[in-house]
From Swiss-Prot:
It comes from Methylobacterium nodulans (strain LMG 21967 / CNCM I-2342 / ORS 2060). Thiolesterase that catalyzes the hydrolysis of S-D-lactoyl-glutathione to form glutathione and D-lactic acid. Binds 2 Zn(2+) ions per subunit. Pathway: Secondary metabolite metabolism; methylglyoxal degradation; (R)-lactate from methylglyoxal: step 2/2. It comes from the Bacteria. Signal peptide: none annotated. Zn(2+) 2 binds at residues 59-60, 132, 170. InterPro entries: Clx_II_MBL, Glyoxalase_II_hydrolase, HAGH_C, Hydroxyacylglutathione_Hdrlase, Metallo-B-lactamas, RibonucZ/Hydroxyglut_hydro. HAMAP family: Glyoxalase_2. The gene is gloB. This is Hydroxyacylglutathione hydrolase. The keyword Zinc applies. Its cofactor is Zn(2+). One of its GO terms (biological process) is methylglyoxal catabolic process to D-lactate via S-lactoyl-glutathione.
């Protein structure tokens, strides 16, 4: 099984290192901050071979030039990001395969937060590196498309096994929990997770990874097809989940 190290970057970005103990290959999922990634590499003793970019936003790619210069890592980025990602060696599209040593992942194009966003899905290991598409108890802002586009991207996750570990690009768990409780106040599983989030944050940690099963039970954006979430945005049970999602996302923007 792979080894994974998560750590804080900038103020609320989450850095991730994915290490294959069989081959000693190691990938960083985005590089929000060069110093934080380099410190994590020093602490683990891992040698960085790859950088897998989820999307072009500055807070996910700022550290790439320095880290590549220090490590020689190969940079793989979404083709649709164009030249917005620095130092790119290879580009990927829907269905392409990425390898980190013996670990084999598939590229999903998951637009909605931005048009070039991708998720890296490692089926054998049940790992999804979701960037800013799916968060613990939340989802990314819709920035470049109608909300239905992000809903379609999120819907792909619903087909994955419940035990899938989801690694996201930011730690917004407390604000996400507050909104989730407002939207789904009678959800006992959500109440328990919100309490856990408070405890974890007090300890200086974060709820990453989450699992798909936990998110299906507690994340209002993945639960847009549930009657309780339709009612929370003054829609009838059975309403189009994409429309419910759009209303939830707009509410969260103002929350």
């Amino acid at each position: 099984m792979p080894e994974i190290r998560t750590f804080l970057c900038r103020s609320d970005n989450i850095g991730v290192l994915l290490h294959d103990p069989v081959t000693s290959a190691c990938a960083a999922i985005d590089v929000p901050e060069a110093g934080a990634v380099l410190r994590a590499l020093k602490e683990t003793g891992w040698r960085l071979t790859d950088i897998l970019v989820t999307h072009r936003h500055f807070d996910h790619v700022e550290g790439i030039p320095e880290v590549k210069a220090r490590t020689g890592a190969r940079v793989t980025a979404p083709a649709k990001a164009g030249d917005a990602v620095p130092e790119v060696d290879a580009t990927v599209r829907e269905g392409d395969v990425v390898k980190v040593g013996s670990l084999v992942g598939t590229v999903w194009e998951t637009p909605g937060h931005c048009a070039d966003h991708v998720t890296y899905w490692f089926e054998r290991e049940r790992l999804a590196f979701a960037g800013d598409t799916l968060f613990t108890l939340g989802c990314g802002r819709v920035m470049e498309s109608p909300p239905e586009v992000l809903w379609r991207s999120l819907s792909r996750f619903l087909a994955l096994p419940d035990e899938t570990a989801i690694y996201s690009g930011h730690d917004y768990v407390l604000s996400n929990a507050r909104f989730a409780l407002a939207a789904d106040p009678d959800n006992s599983n959500l109440k328990a997770r919100a309490e856990l989030a408070e405890r974890v944050k007090r300890d200086g940690r974060f709820l990453i990874p989450t699992t798909l099963g936990e998110e299906k039970a507690t994340n209002p954006f993945l639960r847009a097809g549930e009657p309780a979430l339709a009612r929370s945005v003054d829609m009838a049970p059975g309403s189009d989940p994409a429309a419910v999602f759009a209303a939830l996302r707009e509410w969260k923007n103002r929350f």
